[in-house]
Regions:
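Acidic, metal/ion-coordinating pockets
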Residues: 2-280
Length: 280
């Protein structure tokens, strides 16, 4: 007589406790974004059983850069690493802070001798996780070193220590981001873009096991122009004259991505867009 007891379902990426879950939140914009992240990030870590959280703090200080105080507050609410981009130097006091805080990253393809760190490896209960911050060049005012050879060398070096590698590629052009995804497929666990503040619907795991998304979006005010107040932006488009952009206000959208990784190989098993709403 056969055993009629149904077989236990195979573990899925969302249920297997042995897999590593990395949460990444896109560009945090100003005080509204910071407040939203301070509330939502701890909730997401609990809800999604996150092992390692990364946030982009590029625009967290009034839309331009990040301060030491803000960096510390983001770490206290659950960010293991903070990535940045072209606005990293906007707040002058951050330079001395970065020298002693390796968890706050700036793009790795700045010239040799630039203050701060472009990458870091941290220990977790499920193995070491490496994070690299990279900046693109297409349509970007800052022309840093070519990101393609720079990241290749950085990844090769980091893989000596861990196969679990996450890359925040801060870039404007989607084509440059997509090309970088193919450039790194099979060599890193995930590459997720930032900078445009608009989440893309192209998340996927590439053929060789790298999770990819062109842009994670932003953590900032919904009723805005990619985080900025609407009226000054409209004025600039109408008059073609300079206008000061403040950060928008009101309800906040939290955008990001959840990547599930096999810690033994570093291969991504899934990537999922994350969206939450918060209002003060």
């Amino acid at each position: 007589m056969s055993d009629s007891t149904p077989a236990s379902p195979a573990p899925t990426p969302s249920s297997d406790p042995n897999l590593l879950r990395i949460l990444f939140l896109g560009d945090i914009v100003g005080e509204p974004g910071r407040k939203g992240v301070s509330v939502v990030l701890p909730m997401l870590k609990d809800e999604l059983k996150v092992d390692f959280a990364i946030v982009n703090g590029e625009n967290s200080a009034g839309g331009r850069g990040i301060t030491p105080k803000i960096a510390i507050s983001l770490m206290r609410c659950g960010a293991a690493v903070i990535t940045t981009g072209d606005h990293i130097w906007d707040q002058k006091e951050i330079v001395s802070f970065m020298k002693d805080e390796p968890r706050l990253l700036r793009p790795i393809n700045y010239p040799e001798g630039t203050p701060g760190y472009g990458s870091i490896v941290l220990e977790t209960a499920k193995g070491k996780v490496g994070v690299i911050n990279l900046q693109g060049r297409v349509f970007m005012a800052q022309q840093l070193e070519n990101p393609f050879p720079v990241i290749k060398a950085a990844v090769e070096e980091m893989r000596k220590e861990t196969p679990i590698i996450f890359i925040d590629f801060h870039a404007e052009a989607t084509s440059e981001k997509v090309a970088m995804g193919w450039h790194l497929d099979g060599q890193v666990s995930a590459i997720v873009g930032t900078h445009t503040h608009v989440p893309t619907a192209d998340e996927r795991v590439l053929p060789k096991g790298t999770a990819y998304q062109s842009d994670a979006g932003m953590c900032g005010p919904i009723d805005s122009v990619i985080g900025s107040q609407i009226e000054p932006v409209l004025e600039r488009f109408h008059t073609m004259r300079p206008a000061r952009f403040g950060v928008g206000s009101g309800a906040v959208r939290i955008n990001g991505a959840l990547i599930t990784v096999d810690p033994s190989t570093g291969r991504a098993l899934s990537i999922e867009r994350i969206t939450r709403h918060w209002h003060d």
